[in-house]
């Protein structure tokens, strides 16, 4: 896909087909690939689209590119479907064909979208089950700022895929298994022994402190260390008391995680690492059957193809340690098999997406290669890692508290809302506006959380990004408050008497600002298709920001409520479609909108 979103995906597909047919008619015996190379026009003065396919044909056809372009245009002009869609094509430069959509076709499309709750975005014809694996915090540890990116990027991608009509299984692969549970269960048995006899739930207070205490005892006390190791064996062996303690720890963590998810409006199905325990031996058997398994220093490994260590030898993916234990790679392979496996013994997915930090890229590349070579990825299915960079402080270093600790997600969200509230109260004072406490709390909560989400999603996820409350809460620039304010501005038109629900007959546009807004609005479907394919939410953010800017220029430069009667309905229609597009687009980012701020 081009970096500039195409004007209407359906238009672009129609034009592409018309151009191919015209090229075929112009050069029926050409021994060359006939590709129109259709792309959105790089500048408005070049029209809506540019077809650059004449240039690469010059050599095989032994003709000048402009001559080739002229022959293609003659065939286009003989196609009534094309002439109904476009104005007369212009040949520019060495042989570019510039194409402009007829204004009446654009106006008709705006009308169609006004009556379409999907705003011109079609549902996929062949919906496929998709697994999106995101968030995935560890039990007995609080969610920190590092979980923020996976959680909100994964949620946004899931929303876009759901909107397109796919059945999406949102999976939370929580870290609920492993040797650390030995020390946690031992500590729990010693500090809250009664809980194991009676309680269905236990309140351990600050989970981070509980984890730290257990870790300190494990590091300092050999007897505690020894008991912890025995506890791991008991847990893996299914000892009922150990399982009860493990369950209590998982439940408390789950309750804490859910508070964050509720606050961020995140839906997830928990399926922790422990779910795959029964399937781990079958992973080893499957790799053995595929003749991929090699014993190396007592461990069972698969050596990767095309990936060497510093010594020049192939790197191994260890799937069973020399003591017989399994590891993350084994669990991830079991998860891949299950997710692609046919129902009822699997999820039957056709696309599996992992949203984790870029530091895990090599791990997943290795695991994916092993799964591919073992034959566990069905033909035509897609297995993708969606990596993201670090959240940094304004000093460019990893974001930490003043004390040097990891920033807890709960604290970060609290501060965002508090700062949004301070900004709002200050603005109300300046404007001498009086609002209810309920209004202030609702706006501050919405703006604060929107700012945090949007600041993250608007960055290219692959890069690190610097976290700044001042930047993300600013009313100017590519921020959530700027976009939310555009929605508020349009809601204000209705409050001032503009009927945004007015039944519009044939829309009439004359001003360049109107046409700029029309063209921007009609890019929405191609942007959604791009995000679905490339899994980059920042493309949607960039589009919504550009749309807000184009709308603000239109609203500032062209009268709306004071427009002439014949222009009023059409301009109100543009306002309504802009608000609908912003609301839907922000909703797909997991961001709620407001009618007043």
From Swiss-Prot:
The keyword Transport does not apply. It catalyses: tRNA(Arg) + L-arginine + ATP = L-arginyl-tRNA(Arg) + AMP + diphosphate. A motif ('HIGH' region) lies at residues 137-147. It comes from Parasynechococcus marenigrum (strain WH8102). This is Arginine--tRNA ligase. CDD domains: ArgRS_core. SUPFAM superfamilies: Anticodon-binding domain of a subclass of class I aminoacyl-tRNA synthetases (SSF47323), Arginyl-tRNA synthetase (ArgRS), N-terminal 'additional' domain (SSF55190), Nucleotidylyl transferase (SSF52374). Monomer. Belongs to the class-I aminoacyl-tRNA synthetase family. InterPro entries: aa-tRNA-synth_I_CS (IPR001412), Arg-tRNA-ligase (IPR001278), Arg-tRNA-synth_N (IPR005148), Arg-tRNA-synth_N_sf (IPR036695), ArgRS_core (IPR035684), DALR_anticod-bd (IPR008909), Rossmann-like_a/b/a_fold (IPR014729), tRNAsynth_Ia_anticodon-bd (IPR009080).
């Amino acid at each position: 896909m081009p970096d500039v979103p195409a004007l209407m995906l359906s238009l672009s597909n129609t034009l592409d087909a018309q151009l191919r047919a015209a090229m075929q008619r112009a050069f029926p015996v050409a021994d060359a690939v006939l590709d129109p190379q259709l792309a959105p026009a790089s500048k408005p003065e070049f029209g809506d689209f540019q077809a650059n396919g004449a240039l690469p044909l010059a050599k095989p056809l032994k003709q000048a590119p402009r001559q080739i372009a002229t022959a293609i245009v003659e065939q286009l002009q003989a196609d009534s479907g094309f002439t109904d869609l476009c104005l007369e094509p212009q040949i520019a430069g060495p042989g570019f064909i510039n194409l402009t959509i007829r204004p009446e076709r654009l106006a008709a499309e705006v009308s169609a979208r006004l009556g379409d709750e999907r705003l011109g975005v079609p549902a996929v014809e062949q919906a496929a089950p998709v697994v999106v694996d995101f968030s995935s915090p560890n039990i007995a540890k609080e969610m920190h700022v590092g979980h923020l990116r996976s959680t909100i990027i994964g949620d946004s991608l899931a929303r876009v895929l759901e909107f397109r009509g796919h059945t999406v299984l949102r999976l939370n692969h929580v870290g609920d298994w492993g040797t650390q549970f030995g020390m946690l269960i031992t500590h729990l048995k010693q500090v809250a022994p009664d809980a194991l006899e009676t309680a269905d739930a236990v309140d351990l207070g600050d989970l981070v402190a509980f984890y730290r205490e257990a870790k300190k005892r494990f590091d300092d006390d050999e007897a505690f260390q020894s008991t912890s190791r025995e506890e791991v064996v008991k847990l893996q062996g299914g000892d009922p008391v150990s399982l009860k303690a493990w369950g209590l720890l998982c439940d408390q963590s789950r309750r804490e995680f859910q508070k964050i998810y509720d606050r961020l409006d995140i839906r997830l199905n928990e399926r922790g690492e422990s779910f795959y325990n029964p399937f781990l031996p079958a992973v080893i058997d499957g790799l053995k059957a595929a003749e991929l398994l090699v014993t190396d220093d007592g461990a069972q490994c698969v050596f990767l193809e095309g990936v060497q260590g510093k010594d020049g030898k192939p790197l191994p993916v260890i799937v069973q340690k020399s003591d017989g234990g399994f590891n993350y790679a084994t669990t991830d392979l079991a998860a891949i098999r299950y997710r692609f496996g046919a129902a009822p013994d699997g999820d039957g997915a056709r696309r599996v997406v992992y949203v984790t930090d870029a530091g895990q890229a090599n791990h997943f590349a290795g695991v994916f290669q092993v799964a591919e070579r073992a034959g566990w990825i069905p033909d035509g299915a897609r297995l993708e890692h969606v990596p993201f960079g670090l959240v940094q402080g304004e000093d460019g270093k990893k974001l930490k508290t003043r004390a040097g600790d990891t920033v807890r997600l709960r604290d970060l969200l609290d501060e965002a809302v508090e700062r949004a509230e301070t900004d709002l109260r200050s603005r109300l004072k300046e404007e001498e506006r009086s609002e209810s406490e309920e209004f202030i709390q609702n706006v501050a909560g919405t703006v604060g959380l929107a700012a945090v989400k949007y600041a993250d999603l608007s960055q290219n996820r692959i890069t690190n990004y610097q976290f700044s409350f001042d930047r993300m809460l600013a009313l100017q620039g590519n921020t959530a408050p700027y976009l939310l304010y555009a929605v508020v501005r349009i809601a204000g038109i209705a409050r001032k008497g503009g009927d945004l629900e007015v039944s519009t007959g044939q829309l009439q546009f004359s001003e360049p600002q109107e046409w700029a807004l029309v063209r921007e609005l009609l890019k929405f479907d191609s942007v959604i298709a791009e995000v679905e394919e490339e899994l980059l939410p920042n493309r949607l953010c960039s589009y919504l920001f550009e749309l807000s800017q184009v709308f603000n220029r239109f609203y500032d430069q062209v009268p709306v409520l004071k427009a002439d009667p014949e222009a009023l309905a059409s301009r109100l229609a543009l306002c309504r479609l802009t608000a609908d597009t912003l609301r839907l687009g922000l909703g797909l980012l997991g961001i709620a909108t407001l009618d007043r701020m």
